Regions:
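Cross-family detector of peptidyl-prolyl cis-trans isomerase
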Residues: 1-131
Length: 131
């Protein structure tokens, strides 16, 4: 089921700044329940996302800004562990918020200038397709 068929507003989401303490385990919140095919280990998925740092709410990446979704195979380490675990069971058409502790993100090494060592991350992910 495509987003056009569902006639939902699928513009880039705003990521609300967290009020909770830094996560010590993966937190998953389905903001919109999908009704399409489910993401399973080994499936190739296509998704749009926005990523922000937990400590400051600074956006560090968004597929929406590039106009191209991200395609990857779930569960084989092509993305951070928080994504491999957090997208399992999600259905096409859904929007999911992932609050990812640093050990399931980039850990003590960080990534780039914005994601420092031991930084927890928040992603809001729209699942577009599962194949």
């Amino acid at each position: 089921m495509s987003f056009g068929q569902r006639k939902l507003d699928r513009s880039k989401p705003e990521v609300d700044f967290p009020q909770d303490p830094v996560p010590t385990e993966l937190r998953i919140v389905d903001e919109i329940q999908g009704a399409g095919k489910e993401a399973t280990p080994g499936a190739t998925v296509s998704c749009h996302y926005v990523g922000v740092t937990y400590s400051g709410g600074e956006e560090f990446d968004a597929s929406w800004n590039r106009g191209e979704p991200l395609d990857f195979t779930v569960g084989i380490g092509q993305v951070i562990q928080g994504w491999d675990q957090g997208l399992l069971g999600m259905k096409v058409g859904g929007r999911r918020r992932l609050e990812i502790p640093s050990e399931l993100a980039y850990g003590s090494r960080g990534a780039g200038a914005v994601i420092g060592p031991d930084e927890s991350l928040i992603f809001v992910v729209d699942l577009l397709d599962v194949r």
